């Protein structure tokens, strides 16, 4: 069985009857959603908030009941993947382009469980490019200010056209030559730049990590 599938399906066991659940986006969260769809079919009663249009479509296909985050005060649990995770449970997310909604849903949850395969576990964040969501207006000026923090940037494309997020924004992917020694500081500095909507750094948000390894499940 695929390591992502092992982690994703195991995470679904943390979802209990009556919970309000945030559904993540990406290839690992896909397996959690598939498993939850199966459990709903077997009688599990939950309400879910998707973190992307892609996840919304999958949940609808599996008949998982969906609600709007506007209609609830908080969620019991969100299960989502990550592009990188360190031993302090700090993350880089946004490889799939859903980082803003993912962060809104995660910050509205009492608990955030991150599911990854062992290849995503790193000593220091920053080998994977850091996604930053920016507004399209004057994006080159915003990109230039981001570059002034010492990174190389690439405007994200899809099918040779500018990638547009579910919120009609753009994404700049950033490589920092010396990785990211202090993610919380970098996040704050990036958020001070006018035009930056959100960063893919998730700091002090994760309750638990479930890692699919060749030797089985590991929890952090």
UniProtKB/Swiss-Prot annotation:
InterPro entries this protein is in? NagB/RpiA_transferase-like, Ribose-5P_isomerase, Ribose5P_isomerase_typA_subgr, Ribose5P_isomerase_type_A
Q: Write out the entry's keywords from A to Z.
A: Isomerase
Query: Could you give a GO molecular-function term held by this entry?
Result: ribose-5-phosphate isomerase activity
Superkingdom field:
Bacteria
Give EC number(s), comma-separated.
5.3.1.6
Fetch the CDD domains from UniProt: RPI_A
Q: In which pathway does it act?
A: Carbohydrate degradation; pentose phosphate pathway; D-ribose 5-phosphate from D-ribulose 5-phosphate (non-oxidative stage): step 1/1
BP terms from Gene Ontology: pentose-phosphate shunt, non-oxidative branch
Report the active site residues: 102
Which catalytic reaction applies to this protein? Answer: aldehydo-D-ribose 5-phosphate = D-ribulose 5-phosphate
Broad enzyme group: isomerase
Q: Which residues bind substrate?
A: 25-28, 80-83, 93-96, 120
Q: Which family does it belong to?
A: Belongs to the ribose 5-phosphate isomerase family.
Role description: Catalyzes the reversible conversion of ribose-5-phosphate to ribulose 5-phosphate.
Q: How does it assemble?
A: Homodimer.
Give the NCBIfam families listed for this entry: PRK00702.1, rpiA
Classification via HAMAP family: Rib_5P_isom_A
Q: What is this protein called?
A: Ribose-5-phosphate isomerase A
């Amino acid at each position: 069985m695929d390591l992502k599938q092992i982690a994703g399906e195991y995470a679904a066991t943390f979802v209990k009857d009556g919970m309000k659940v945030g559904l993540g986006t990406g290839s690992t969260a896909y397996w959690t959603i598939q498993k939850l769809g199966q459990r709903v079919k077997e009688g599990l009663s939950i309400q879910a908030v998707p973190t992307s249009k892609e996840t919304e479509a999958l949940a609808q296909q599996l008949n998982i009941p969906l609600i709007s985050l506007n209609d609830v005060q908080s969620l019991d649990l969100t299960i989502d993947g990550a592009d990188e995770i360190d031993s302090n449970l700090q993350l880089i997310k946004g490889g799939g382009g859903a980082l803003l909604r993912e962060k809104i849903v995660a910050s509205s949850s009492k608990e955030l469980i991150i599911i990854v395969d062992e290849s995503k576990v790193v000593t220091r964040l920053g080998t994977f490019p850091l996604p930053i969501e920016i507004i399209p207006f004057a994006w080159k000026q915003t990109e230039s200010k981001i570059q002034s923090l010492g990174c190389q940037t690439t405007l994200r494309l899809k099918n040779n056209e500018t990638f547009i997020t579910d919120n009609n924004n753009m994404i700049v992917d950033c490589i920092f030559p010396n990785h990211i020694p202090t993610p919380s500081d970098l996040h704050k500095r990036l958020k001070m730049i006018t035009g930056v909507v959100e960063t893919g750094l998730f700091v002090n948000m994760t309750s638990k990590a479930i890692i699919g390894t060749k030797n089985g499940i590991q929890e952090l």
